[in-house]
Amino acid sequence: IERFGAHAVVLATGGYGNVFFLSTNAMGCNGSAAWQAYKRGAMFGNPCFVQIHPTCIPVHGDQQSKLTLMSESLRNDGRVWVPKKLEDAKKLQAGTLNPNDIPDEDRDFYLERRYPAFGNLVPRDVASRAAKERCDAGFGVNNTGKAVFLDFKYAIDRLGRHTIEERYGNLFQMYEKITAVDPYNNPMMIYPAIHYSMGGLWVDYNLMTTIPGLYAIGECNFSDHGANRLGASALMQGLADGYFILPYTIGDYLAHDIQTPKIKTNTPEFDAAEKNVTDHLRRLYDIKGTKSPDHFHKMLGHIMWDYIGMAREAEGLKKAIKMIAELKEEFYKDLRVTGEFTAMNNELEKAGRVADFIDIAHLMALDALDRNESCGGHFRLESVTEEGEAKRDDEHYQYVSVWEYKGDNKEPELHK
């Protein structure tokens, strides 16, 4: 444990998508920095707004720790489909039918059918929910039933293989290396996965949190994307926050401290902070239970995906809140951390991350339960149109949900 003192601190630590265990996020990406700031006075905005990406390589086993994103550009030329006949889907799931043997008239190009004006280029949340609906109805195309086809046969016939190679060659190569399936001659399989956190630490127009001198930029703040990020706009936010805004606003803040000497770390405040961290780590290490941090992370991921994933409802969210509380209780009773306490210990670090994820999950569920409307990446089954699409309620919910930490085992306070 090391001490650092600073006149100002910038968090650029990414999102909290790995609360779902499986996501497209890097393995080292976690919500711990933002969460610890939240517990020390920085407010958290819109935690329930997370984006699910429609074009990811499907889950293919119990030992995966990460999902692979296939670029959304593939939907420019690929056509998304599942079989029209349930018996064909069952054969695909059993591995007894080649998708190339299904004639066009027996293929359901469901995005083109439902959204003729947009076809396969509908927004990410729409494409993701549509894929889930088809798979939930039994039309999934792999052995888990959790995949749909993204087919380039028609684009190759129309444009030629050379053009498709020029546009997507690196993506096709990556797909074949991972799946051992040639996407030039066979349709890709895709399925939605957690991708981006629109929620994050609340910041003002200067990118400062509610803790003076603490800034949050990029995905770890809530500021730019509302309820649903558009493709490539994370790059825009990185440029806006890190290049155009922060150098000026943090400079203005530091100008008032120009005469302040170097921050000393041998103070009672630093002593208390270090003791708090050490005590927490020692508590985790000394549980001496039977289950690994990964076990609890996977269990949390199942709860999140099932009840706080693409489609949410009050009953499921209330159930999730109860299940998360039960998981937290079990975590602090039956966690086992291997290795030495005083040495570099990846399992102990992981345990700390999972402890934070469990608390983040609770806040996400509270926020999703409070927002009884469908908006962007947040889809409530109680708030849909006659066609089954998202139905917003701007009269009652056109606000940023800003949550304030009130202490361990206490409900946070919502500011609108």
Language-model features: where?
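C-terminal amphipathic alpha-helical interaction region
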Residues: 330-416
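Long, amphipathic alpha-helical stalk/connector segments used for oligomerization, subunit docking
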Residues: 252-343
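Conserved phosphate/anionic-ligand binding catalytic regions in large, soluble enzymes, centered on
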Residues: 107, 222, 235-244, 368-383
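An anion/pyrophosphate-binding glycine-rich loop and adjacent beta-alpha core
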Residues: 36, 43-177, 248-251
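Glycine-rich loop(s) and the adjacent beta-strand/alpha-helix scaffold that form part
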Residues: 8-63, 67, 225-248
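Core beta-strand elements of the Rossmann-like FAD/NAD(P) dinucleotide-binding domain
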Residues: 1-8, 210
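A glycine-rich phosphate-binding loop feature that marks nucleotide/adenosyl-phosphate handling sites
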Residues: 51-60, 189-197, 258-280, 377-389
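FAD-binding beta-loop-beta segment adjacent to the flavin cofactor pocket
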Residues: 194-216, 220-221
